[in-house]
Amino acid sequence: MIKVLITGDTHIPTRARKIPKIMEEIIQSNKPYQAVFFTGDLISEKVLRYVKSLSEKVFIVEGNMDYLSFPEKVTTEINEINIGLIHGHQVFPRGNIEGLIRIAKEMNVQILINGHTHYAKIVEVTGEHGSKIVLANPGSLTGVWSGGFASMRPSLIIGYFKSREVFLELYELYGTKLETKGYVFTF
């Protein structure tokens, strides 16, 4: 089984000082990760060093607030499932499902990881000929504000890939209460 961390939009130190303790505990207690996907807006080199310490394989895209240089889009594959990573500022309005589907098709990916909205959301869309696209947005790891409809809740996703089955576990912090939701997809 392959385990990955999906996170982003920390905005440290401009909008948050640090990762909330409970989110840090989740990250540390679930190690090791075979890969980390970061949706951009990490802002500082300190956060970059931290993210790179979590796995030997780290994928990062440039957010609209990053001054550090990263690619705009990344594609990779796990168990023959094509995965794309973008920040999400490429679509308007923020989080627009049709725009994200268009990008997923352009990138030829079955899973599109995106951020920017600061609102965690996992949806499956059935396309032509029964094909499916999963849109996975981990929200903001620090739960900071954004220019749209941010949830203001720290959140992240841990993904498990076993053959052609993918289990995504979404963690969201509501004040001091941690909630988890699981999603299973077969490709």
Where are these regions (language model features)?
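Beta-strand-turn-beta hairpins that frame and shape the catalytic cleft
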Residues: M1-L5, T75-G84, T126-L135, F161-L168
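N-terminal active-site segment of His-dependent metallophosphoesterases
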Residues: M1-K57, D66-E72, M152-S155, Y183-F187
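Binuclear metal-dependent phosphoesterase catalytic core
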Residues: R102, M107, A136-F187
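Active-site environment of divalent metal-dependent phosphoester hydrolases
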Residues: I12-R15, L42-K46, M65-F70, V91-G95, ...
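Active-site neighborhood of phospho(di)ester-bond hydrolases with catalytic His/Asp-centered motifs
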Residues: I6-G8, A35-D41, F59-G63, G84-H87, ...
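Binuclear metal-dependent hydrolase catalytic cores centered on His/Asp/Glu-rich metal-binding motifs
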Residues: K18, I22-E25, H89-M107, V144-M152
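Helix-adjacent hinge/juxtasegments
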Residues: K57-N108
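Short acidic, glycine/proline-enriched helix-loop-strand junctions
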Residues: L54-V58, V123-T142
